């Protein structure tokens, strides 16, 4: 992830991520201790004019160092990849768009951002990295690096928690599938949604480790559960919900009695974990109700009006699922990684979940089924209500915002398969880790290539764009494509190494045996 992510950081033009300039302003402010800012009104250039009423409630202004500040909270390449990203190589006003005069590079400047009221948690590290740079372009890239390193740390922790030396062929399959190209991309641009995804992933992985270890759960695992759960809760407004879903999954997998016994066996460390998660949820509520005000819905509308949009969102489910795999840049008009990536990744996740449902015990199958049903129901409900009540229009939600929820059933399915794969005996490929690693690596590489092509020649340009490139990243395309290739080979290599890993030597259990 570090190799491919590093390539993404540089290959992505400055700026190009969804709402990235607005998030960058927020990160700069948080890093210098400005958490709330001054209320302000958004300009009429807001990308979704129908939701200006909401943005006016979330817009704040901050006093920032002029040398690091962007020219505005917009981007010249937002929502339109019919042309290359060559405008990002122009003067500051062209790059950031909406500038009326060349921005000053000395002293301080006051800028507004429509992302001004969101929790400061996931802005701090990117902002601190940005303050080490010498200008706005390098500042944004440094902030991206801070976001990537945070994600790498959380995903590494999740991998260590999920790793089982006795079942090395299967223990990381869920994690491999949860880190979609979109998960990786969102952690290489400045956007707290990326950190929200991996925080949810890390907390869910910790709870699955508790399920595996039961009453023998170690002190470090309980500490990790408290830390990651608290982080998940205070990252974004939906964080407490993601934490609650993950916790409910653990109780469902263990059963109420076993869950209580596990908590009692954990003693004060289990109490710390529970207290930390609850404290995180309370802090998040305090932020929205005491520090800033929860944005009010559009006047004249209520949640029931969203029912009219249910069929619209339900009909767009396939597109929303695709948006959790690819769909880079600002929306609408985002960059697709192509049908192969969406179909291949979707097929791999479906296969993983199907195998888990086949081998899982009754309770495990119920938990997976409930998680999938809740994921779909929440997607439709949230999209329908947001479309009307908040004025987002269309489906009311985009795929990347749903990834913090979707990673939970994927990880649960991976752990269920790891624990029960012997029930299928020879029907489960012993090289399954390699079978999934090869197309996963290919999808990650293709995703970056398709984004690079849009940046270089636009969406309508030639697929093999290197000789026709109108925009190039620093040092050209070659080093970043080589680094991406090395990262993809590392994924394949990891899958190959797991093929030869040991198993627990368990005797195959017939599928007719079905105990809770």
Language-model features: where?
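Short acidic/glycine- and proline-prone juxtamembrane loop motifs at membrane-interface regions
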Residues: 188-196
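Transmembrane-helix signature of polytopic, membrane-embedded enzymes
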Residues: 137-138, 159-181
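Perimembrane helix-loop-helix junctions
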Residues: 206-212, 242-278
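Transmembrane helical bundles and short interhelical boundary loops of multi-pass, membrane-embedded
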Residues: 270-281, 288-304, 428-516
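Membrane-lumen/periplasm interface segments of multi-pass, membrane-embedded glycan/lipid transferases
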Residues: 261-360, 417, 467-484
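Membrane-interface alpha helices of multi-pass inner-membrane proteins
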Residues: 221-237, 241-248
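Transmembrane-helix motifs of polytopic, lipid-linked glycan transferases
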Residues: 142-166
